[in-house]
Swiss-Prot record:
Residues 116-164 are annotated as: Substrate binding. It comes from Penicillium sp. Its main location: secreted. InterPro entries: PLipase_C/P1_nuclease_dom_sf, S1/P1nuclease. Pfam families: S1-P1_nuclease. The keyword Transcription does not apply. This is Nuclease PA3. Keywords: Disulfide bond, Endonuclease, Glycoprotein, Hydrolase, Metal-binding, Nuclease, Secreted, Zinc. GO terms for biological process: DNA catabolic process. Glycans are attached at residues 92, 138, 184, 197. It catalyses: a ribonucleoside 3'-phosphate + H2O = a ribonucleoside + phosphate.
């Protein structure tokens, strides 16, 4: 996701993080701000663009070597790659965020990475190798020539919300939380975190990746990439996918909160 999506995931998470876990996370991040997660949600994207952080680029995705739209699947052993991927990163930083042998800066970095990568995993094209996760599928959206990946990351969410400031993300998150509390998502939400376990991070994160990857076949490109390259994706394609984008952002926030709560719970138990 782009800045709007990541901040919205973080604001949804902030709603569901327990007060005790919130204090713990604020202590790690050195922030008592009301946007303590949202304000750092895109740090990992900024970091990977620096010379010091370019090593981390592969951690933002897993390249599922499948065959959409005919076949979508994630295989951790097949797809993760020697330089790591989102799944291995979530496992690594889940361990590092509370490793007492590491520095407070290591802990803060780990939490910043977790906030970002758990969000990225719900963007279907971050769980897909085809055309570099859709980056090489050139399309037109609302009159602009861009690529399918950036439309999913940034331009379609911004079209829905109308901006990308923290205040826009906070407003969107409130709507998504309402849907979780008493709306379209209420019956689904417990299923989003079913079986999630910080002691089994590879298994858990692979399930998250598989959940989003399946949408590449059913929602993102159900008729293949070529079908998206004629005409403008707005409004017909946009209308067909925007509900899924909202659902995936909500899932990311709900899962992130549960993950933080579980990590904090294991800290207390030590």
């Amino acid at each position: 996701w782009g800045a709007l999506g990541h901040a919205t995931v973080a604001y949804v998470a902030q709603h569901y993080v327990s007060p005790e876990a919130a204090s713990w996370a604020q202590g790690i991040l050195g922030s008592s701000s009301s946007s303590y997660l949202a304000s750092i949600a895109s740090w990992a994207d900024e970091y990977r663009l620096t010379s010091a952080g370019k090593w981390s680029a592969s951690l933002h995705f897993i390249d599922a070597e499948d065959n959409p739209p005919t076949n979508c699947n994630v295989d951790y052993e097949r797809d993760c790659g020697s330089s790591g991927c989102s799944i291995s990163a979530i496992a690594n930083y889940t361990q590092r965020v509370s490793d007492s042998s590491l520095s407070s800066e290591n802990h803060a970095e780990a939490l910043r990475f977790l906030v970002h990568f758990i969000g990225d995993m719900t963007q279907p094209l971050h769980d897909e190798a085809y055309a570099v996760g859709g980056n090489k599928i050139n399309v037109t959206f609302d009159g602009y020539h861009d690529n399918l990946h950036s439309d999913w990351d940034t331009y379609m969410p911004q079209k829905l919300i109308g901006g990308h400031a923290l205040s826009d993300a906070e407003s969107w998150a409130k709507t998504l939380v309402q849907n979780i509390e008493s709306g379209n998502y209420t019956a689904q939400a417990t299923g989003w975190i079913k079986g999630d376990n910080i002691s089994e991070p590879i298994t858990t994160a692979t399930r998250w990746a598989s959940d989003a990857n399946a949408l590449v076949c059913t929602v993102v490109m159900p008729h293949g990439a070529a079908a998206l390259q004629t005409g403008d994706l707005y409004p017909t394609y946009y209308d067909s996918v925007i509900d899924t984008i909202e659902l995936q952002i909500a899932k990311g926030g709900y899962r992130l909160a549960n993950w933080i709560n579980e990590i904090h719970g294991s800290e207390i138990a030590k």
